Every structure is written in C-alpha cells, then in structure tokens.
Design a protein with these regions (language model features):
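A glycine- and Lys/Arg-enriched "phosphate-lid" helix/loop adjacent to the NTP-binding pocket
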Residues: 106-169, 180-181
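Conserved lysine of the Walker
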Residues: 16
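Conserved nucleotide-sensing/catalytic segment adjacent to the nucleotide-binding pocket
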Residues: 50-110
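Phosphate-end processing signature that detects enzymes handling 5′-triphosphorylated RNA
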Residues: 198-360
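Hydrophobic positions on the alpha1 helix immediately C-terminal to the Walker A/P-loop
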Residues: 19
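Conserved substrate/cofactor phosphate-moiety recognition/catalytic segment
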Residues: 24-68
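P-loop (Walker A) phosphate-binding loop of NTP-binding proteins
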Residues: 11
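NTP-dependent small-molecule kinase module
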Residues: 2, 156, 160-206
Length: 360
C-alpha cells in the first residue's frame, strides 16, 4: 500500500484552512490517491470543550491535545489496514509535534515520557512537513481572524509562528512556504511540494559554505534549534553511477529513525529521489541487498533565522552550512562563512570513511 503522510502546520494566519481546501481539490482532481484529512485537535477542543486561555497551565491543555491527537493518528493507521484503497494521502491539520510550540523542551520531554514516546519516533511518522509562514510577520499583508478559536494578537502570533517551525526542525523533510501577498502564489508553492512528494522526486537550488572556526554555535539549544546525530551509509549502486544510494540512521536522545534516499548533486542543484522513512528491519534488508561501501558520521544542527531554515553539518574537523538559495537571504551575525562549496560530491567524498565491506 502506498501511503504519504503530510503534516500541515504553521502559526496563526498561515492560511491552513484555505490551503487545505485547495489540497482537497488538487488530490481529487489530479491524482488517483484517496485523501484523508485529520482535523486540528486544538481547535476542536477550543470550540467545543475548553479554550487554552481558560486552563490553569499550558501543560495540562497540551497534554489533552497530545492524547487526543495521538488517538486520532493511531485511528487513521487502523482504518488504513482495512481500507481497500491502494494509494492514500493523509493530511494532518497540525501534527502531534505542534504541542512543542507551547512548551519548553523540558516540559515537552516530560509530556513524551508520560506516554512512553520519543520525539524522533513521532517525527518519523510523517513523510513530509509543510510549514505555512504566518502573514503576521509582514506589515503589508493583512493579518486575519477567520478562525474563531484564535486568540493571539499580531506580536504573539509572530512568536508562536517562530516556535511552531522550531518545533519541527528535527524533521528530515521540512518545507518552509513563505507568506505571499498573492494567496494563489502560496497555494501554488504548496501544491508543487505535494506534487513532488507524490512523484518521488524533488529538485532544490541549494547553497553550501564551509564555516569559519569563529562561528559561534553556543547560542543554539533544544529550545531554539535541533541537533541530531546522523550516520550516512553509502551503498553500492550499479544501476546509475550519477546517483548515490544512501541509508541514514538518525539518533536523538536514545531514539532512532531510518531513511533511504537517492541523491544527486549538480552544481547548486540537489536532486532527491524516493526519500522514505523506513523501519530498522527495512534498513538492514536494504544494506544487505546493496552492500555498504563507505560511511559518514556527522551532526546536523538545524535552526531558523529571518524566516529561513539553515542546517549546520559538522564532520570530523569540518563544518558546512546548507540552505535553500534565496537572493534576499541573510545569515545570522554569529555565523561566519569561509568559502562557498562548488563541488559537493568532492566535498562529501573527502568526509567518507571507505570500507571494503560492512556487516550491519
């Protein structure tokens, strides 16, 4: 069964309600996928039971949201077991990680522990996360109040919007969709992302720079960024030498997730084909099937600045920063760029530890 799980998230006035309707139209009119929409849990509670501003503390409300959201997501998984549709897209109007936007890392960890869950485990349940930037960041775009459950003023909305995207920084396929004056442009951006996911291919114009040692990364912690350890296993590929078959094992706080993807670098363009979250069992099966020829161990620090996502990748003795190309992009003052990396294949090859044969 082909299942694509998409979390649609964002702060107040990000346009989720409007874009959800457009997603419904697109999927039903242009694909052969069955579409399942999982409604927003916090809004259900606010409209029918209790508003977040009426509770004694944020933790109690988020605990209730978490419990209901987790039940709904499990319920959808159960339904799919006896669904006769072979191809399904599930769109979650906010996912379970959105709870973190209202709690600090310590409280969120406590919440997860009470349900015996791990953050990375929950993140890997989604194939794609689409973050819709709120118009509250801009003075030239109207900030609306079409959702009756909304209670934030514009300043609070900006803060909540930033906390929302920061909550999802640990996801390997997080897409940031900027707010636009023309709503149709934002809709088109979202549809393009979903279309790429359906077709198992995405091309991104990226830039990579080596970092100077004077860069200060000490300002980042679990409350404003995400640091994940990753090991990339490069597999033998006799089918197409231009593409790299890569298995990735990710780890965070004694939790693990696994990814299989095919990647090609061409100057400033990165092409990714068929990136999927997989089980540990599937990870081992694929490794045995193709054979591992080299590995790279690294740390990936993801942070959000000036409404853009950055990844700092640390190897043994070297650091680089990667981001989607944007002519208006600003790099934070604590980040010092050394030089642009023009040949990513060459740079990555220099970080590899080559082996004759790896038994996993």
């Amino acid at each position: 069964m082909d299942i694509i799980k998409i979390a649609l998230t964002g702060g107040p006035s990000g346009g989720k309600t409007m874009i959800l309707e457009k997603i419904k139209e697109y999927v039903r009119e242009n694909t052969d996928y069955n579409l399942i929409i999982v409604p927003e849990t916090a809004t259900e509670l606010s409209n029918n039971i209790i508003r977040p501003q009426d509770v004694l503390n944020a933790y109690d409300f988020q605990n209730t949201v978490f419990k209901r959201q987790y039940f709904k997501e499990c319920e959808v998984d159960d339904v799919l077991k006896y669904n006769d549709k072979k191809k399904n897209i599930i769109v979650y109007d906010r996912g379970i990680i959105d709870n973190k936007a209202y709690l600090n890392q310590e409280l969120f960890d406590m919440l997860l522990s009470s349900y015996d869950k791990k953050e990375l485990e929950l993140l890997s349940n989604y194939d794609l996360v689409i973050y819709l930037e709120s118009v509250s960041h801009y003075d030239n775009i109207e900030y609306g109040f079409n959702n009756k459950a909304r209670y934030e003023d514009k300043k609070s909305a900006v803060q909540l919007d930033n906390k929302t995207v920061e909550a999802w920084l640990g996801h390997n396929n997080l897409k940031v969709v900027r707010a636009r004056e023309n709503k149709q442009d934002k809709i088109d951006d979202v549809i393009k992302i979903i279309d790429d996911e359906i077709n198992d291919i995405r091309k991104e114009k990226i830039e990579n720079y080596e970092l100077d040692n004077e860069s200060d990364l000490s300002i980042y912690d679990d409350n404003n960024s995400k640091l994940i350890n990753e090991t990339d296993y490069y597999l033998e590929n006799i089918d197409n030498k231009d593409y790299k078959y890569i298995l990735t094992k990710r780890s965070y706080k004694n939790s693990f997730s696994y990814i299989f993807k095919t990647v090609k670098y061409n100057l400033d363009e990165k092409t990714t084909i068929n990136e999927k979250n997989i089980s540990e069992k599937e990870f081992l099966r694929i490794a045995c099937k193709y054979g591992v020829i080299s590995i790279i161990e690294k740390e990936v620090l993801s942070f959000y600045y000036d409404r853009r996502k950055f990844d700092v990748i640390s190897y043994d003795g070297k650091k680089r920063i990667e981001f989607i190309y944007d002519k208006d992009l600003k790099v934070p003052s604590n980040i010092k760029l050394k030089k642009k990396i023009d040949d990513m294949d060459d740079f990555i090859n220099n970080q590899k530890k080559f082996i004759k044969k790896l038994k996993i």
